[in-house]
UniProtKB/Swiss-Prot annotation:
Coiled coil: none
Entry keywords, A to Z: Cytoplasm, Lyase, Schiff base
Cellular component, GO, one term: cytoplasm
MF terms in GO: deoxyribose-phosphate aldolase activity
UniProt pathway annotation: Carbohydrate degradation; 2-deoxy-D-ribose 1-phosphate degradation; D-glyceraldehyde 3-phosphate and acetaldehyde from 2-deoxy-alpha-D-ribose 1-phosphate: step 2/2
GO biological-process terms attached to the record: 2-deoxyribose 1-phosphate catabolic process; carbohydrate catabolic process; deoxyribonucleotide catabolic process
InterPro entries, A to Z: Aldolase_TIM (IPR013785), DeoC (IPR011343), DeoC/FbaB/LacD_aldolase (IPR002915), DeoC_typeI (IPR028581)
UniProt protein name: Deoxyribose-phosphate aldolase
Biological function: Catalyzes a reversible aldol reaction between acetaldehyde and D-glyceraldehyde 3-phosphate to generate 2-deoxy-D-ribose 5-phosphate.
Length: 220
């Protein structure tokens, strides 16, 4: 199995420096990861550095709270794609979901999907803040809104991916969407558990450790 092609090699810490971005770019090229997942401020630079490689640039929208307006998320998405992003991971309006304002949640996702103009959209539902019923509803709304993936976590809300959540999400969306597991996937054992549960993409800062069969102490 080519583990690397399942991995979005991730660096989303607010204090990320250019040197650290250079490091994950070089690691992504060396191991041929599916993408690097970075904050929007680094997208243009990373896209230039990765030109000619198979590694995609993935960035985050409305991150990490999901509480910015739909209009803001739309602008962020268009800007990121114009600067070279091929994939965007957006955070849903979590409060609206908990309020039962499902139409607002769906329209928020649809706004980003439309702005992405055919690029891959992954919808972060922040599982650690949701009940199982809410996880199912968020996954259903992502499907109806036309997203490509539903994703477990930002890694910033105190909890990450679990095999149980991944399975619940996959059972909900079926073959229509893929599932990305992120947050706390630190080693090859974690990685395999997520794939067995139905994930087809893994977001992790421990990408190198995973493909080398080592352990990482990273939370994301």
């Amino acid at each position: 199995m080519n583990y690397a092609k399942y991995i979005d090699h991730t660096l989303l810490k607010p204090e990320s420096t250019r040197n650290q971005i250079d490091k994950i770019i070089e690691e992504a090229k060396a191991f041929n990861f599916k993408s690097i997942c970075i904050n929007p401020t680094h997208v243009k630079y990373a896209a230039e550095q990765l030109k000619g490689s198979d590694v995609l640039v993935c960035t985050v929208i409305g991150f990490p709270l999901g509480a910015s307006t739909t209009e803001t998320k739309i602008f962020e998405t268009k800007d990121a794609i114009n600067k070279g992003a091929s994939e965007v991971d957006m955070v849903i309006n979590i409060g609206a979901l908990k309020d039962g304002r499902f139409e607002d949640v769906q329209k928020d996702i649809e706004g980003v999907v439309g702005a992405a103009n055919g690029k891959t959209v992954k919808v972060i539902i922040e599982t650690c803040l949701l009940t199982d019923e809410e996880k199912v509803k968020a996954s259903e709304l992502s499907k109806v809104a036309g997203a490509d993936f539903v994703k477990t976590s930002t890694g910033f809300a105190g909890g990450g991916a679990t095999p149980e959540d991944v399975k619940l999400m996959k059972d909900t969306v079926g073959d229509d969407l893929e599932v990305k597991a992120s947050g706390g996937v630190r080693n090859l054992e974690d990685f395999n558990h997520m794939l067995e549960a139905g994930a087809t993409r893994i977001g992790a800062s421990a990408g190198v450790e995973i493909v080398q069969g080592l352990e990482s102490d990273s939370d994301y």
